[in-house]
């Protein structure tokens, strides 16, 4: 994802790097807990496996996003799902955890000639995720951040925990 010009006013996305995954999950939980009663907050993830990993950290009232948007009503609350499930929707705060180099792109079962295609697909998915944020975007990772996000430090408010 190579930004040319920022199309939106507002704060830079936060990019928070963790030493361990449990601390990352706890920050996601804290961000959702702080804001979901007054704002729409979405936790967007790459895979259903990651959804299962984060679900226990979310409020019991959190709503799973589905690709079929029938009956969708916007409003404050906690939402979670895949990047695909959020397509076409917007949220006040979007949290995108697990953006480490080891998770995205997922090259675990790929052949060398598939790497470029998989990376392009994952870049498109990241684009869908980051563009769901109306006012705040928080990106998190444990270890090194994926190379699919721009490396320019000027684009983020970076921190480590």
List the model feature ranges, each with a label.
Residues 1-72:
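Helicase P-loop NTPase motor core
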Residues 21, 48-51, 85-86, 100-101, ...:
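Short, solvent-exposed loop/turn segments at secondary-structure junctions
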Residues 31-52, 78, 98, 108-111, ...:
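Acidic, Mg2+-coordinating catalytic modules of nucleic-acid enzymes
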Residues 52-57, 91, 149-152:
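A short acidic (Asp/Glu
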Residues 59-64, 78-81, 152-161:
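Active-site regions of enzymes building and remodeling cell-envelope glycoconjugates
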Residues 98-161:
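C-terminal accessory regions
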């Amino acid at each position: 994802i190579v930004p040319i010009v920022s199309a939106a006013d507002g704060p830079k996305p936060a990019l928070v790097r963790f030493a361990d995954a449990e601390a990352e999950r706890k920050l996601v939980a804290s961000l959702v807990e702080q804001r979901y009663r007054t704002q729409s907050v979405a936790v967007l993830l790459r895979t259903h496996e990651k959804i299962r990993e984060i679900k226990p950290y979310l409020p019991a009232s959190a709503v799973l996003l589905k690709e079929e948007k029938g009956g969708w009503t916007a409003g404050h609350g906690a939402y979670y799902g895949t990047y695909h499930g959020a397509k076409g929707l917007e949220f006040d705060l979007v949290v995108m955890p697990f953006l480490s180099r080891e998770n995205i792109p997922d090259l675990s079962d790929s052949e060398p000639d598939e790497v470029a295609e998989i990376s392009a697909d994952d870049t498109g998915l990241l684009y869908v995720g980051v563009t769901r944020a109306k006012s705040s975007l928080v990106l998190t990772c444990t270890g090194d951040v994926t190379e699919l996000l721009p490396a320019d430090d000027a684009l983020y408010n970076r921190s480590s925990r």
